[in-house]
């Protein structure tokens, strides 16, 4: 065998041997391919689970569902607001210029007569049948207590069309002064508010009045202390 033949046989044998895949570049390439495959499989699995369990879905369906929920709510709010504007309501205050009597007035600031309620003969006239909140407050005061007890009353009455006699709906009595010596009375100025309120079934053209027994003790130092009103429910 010649030398050239031996060299050729060695080269052919080297070519026949499998080449190693090792080396820095080969290892990095295999690692990148494995990581990419893992991320791809994990992402596909996560997307499938989200779609399967309904966590995500078409935005169009979500938008339509939201609109279906909001539309009845908006309609209800609009209807409630419109109904509130149409209900009878009244709020009147006492006239401080009316000496010795409790005279209700509708011409001062923060007073209101709406949707059929009238103020006639110092009474509120109900325009329609229904449930009404009736309320009133008075404030009494004095510089000193007299030697005899003072009894203050506040009453809301109803004169109904179905029967002729006036009936008390709400009433309260208070006694801020229990009597005493003149020296004790001089040092004891007093204030006594009385608030009345309740819900009643009223009829059209019923007349409501709020009255007291001692108007001389009414306190008009601040506005909004003595008032009377109704609100349809």
Swiss-Prot record:
Pfam families: TNF. Residues 1-34 are cytoplasmic. The modification Phosphoserine is found at residue 2. Disulfide bonds join 145-177. GO terms for molecular function: cytokine activity; tumor necrosis factor receptor binding. Glycans are attached at residue 80. The soluble form derives from the membrane form by proteolytic processing. The membrane-bound form is further proteolytically processed by SPPL2A or SPPL2B through regulated intramembrane proteolysis producing TNF intracellular domains (ICD1 and ICD2) released in the cytosol and TNF C-domain 1 and C-domain 2 secreted into the extracellular space. The membrane form, but not the soluble form, is phosphorylated on serine residues. Dephosphorylation of the membrane form occurs by binding to soluble TNFRSF1A/TNFR1. The keyword Acetylation does not apply. Keywords: Cell membrane, Cytokine, Disulfide bond, Glycoprotein, Lipoprotein, Membrane, Myristate, Phosphoprotein, Secreted, Signal-anchor, Transmembrane, Transmembrane helix. It is found in: Cell membrane. Residues 88-233 form the THD domain. PROSITE patterns: THD_1, THD_2. It is a single-pass type II membrane protein. GO terms for cellular component: cell surface; extracellular space; plasma membrane. The record marks 34-35, 39-40, 49-52, 76-77 as: Cleavage. One of its GO terms (biological process) is positive regulation of canonical NF-kappaB signal transduction. Its main location: membrane. The chain crosses the membrane at residues 35-57. A lipid is attached at residues 19-20 (N6-myristoyl lysine). Residues 58-233 are extracellular. Homotrimer. Interacts with SPPL2B. Cytokine that binds to TNFRSF1A/TNFR1 and TNFRSF1B/TNFBR. It is mainly secreted by macrophages and can induce cell death of certain tumor cell lines. It is potent pyrogen causing fever by direct action or by stimulation of interleukin-1 secretion and is implicated in the induction of cachexia, Under certain conditions it can stimulate cell proliferation and induce cell differentiation. Induces insulin resistance in adipocytes via inhibition of insulin-induced IRS1 tyrosine phosphorylation and insulin-induced glucose uptake. Belongs to the tumor necrosis factor family. This is Tumor necrosis factor.
């Amino acid at each position: 065998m010649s030398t050239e033949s031996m060299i050729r046989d060695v080269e052919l044998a080297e070519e026949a041997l499998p080449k190693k895949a090792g080396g820095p570049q080969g290892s990095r390439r295999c690692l990148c391919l494995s990581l990419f495959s893992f991320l791809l499989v994990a992402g596909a699995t996560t997307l499938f689970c989200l779609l399967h369990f309904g966590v995500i879905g078409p935005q169009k369906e979500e938008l339509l569902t939201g609109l279906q929920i909001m539309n009845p709510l908006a309609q209800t709010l609009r209807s409630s607001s419109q109904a509130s504007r149409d209900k009878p309501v009244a709020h009147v205050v006492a006239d401080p210029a009316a000496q010795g009597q409790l005279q209700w007035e509708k011409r001062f600031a923060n007073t209101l007569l709406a949707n059929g309620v009238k103020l006639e003969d110092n009474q509120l006239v109900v325009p329609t049948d229904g449930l009404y909140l009736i309320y009133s407050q008075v404030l009494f005061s004095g510089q000193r207590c007299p030697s005899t007890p003072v009894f203050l009353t506040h009453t809301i009455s109803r004169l109904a069309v179905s029967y002729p006699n006036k009936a008390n709906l709400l009433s309260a009595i208070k006694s801020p002064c229990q009597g005493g010596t003149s020296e004790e009375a001089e040092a004891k100025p007093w204030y006594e508010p009385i608030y009345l309120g309740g819900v009643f079934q009223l009829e059209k053209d019923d007349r409501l009045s709020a009255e007291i027994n001692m108007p001389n003790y009414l306190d008009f130092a601040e506005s909004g202390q003595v008032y009377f009103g109704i609100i349809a429910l």
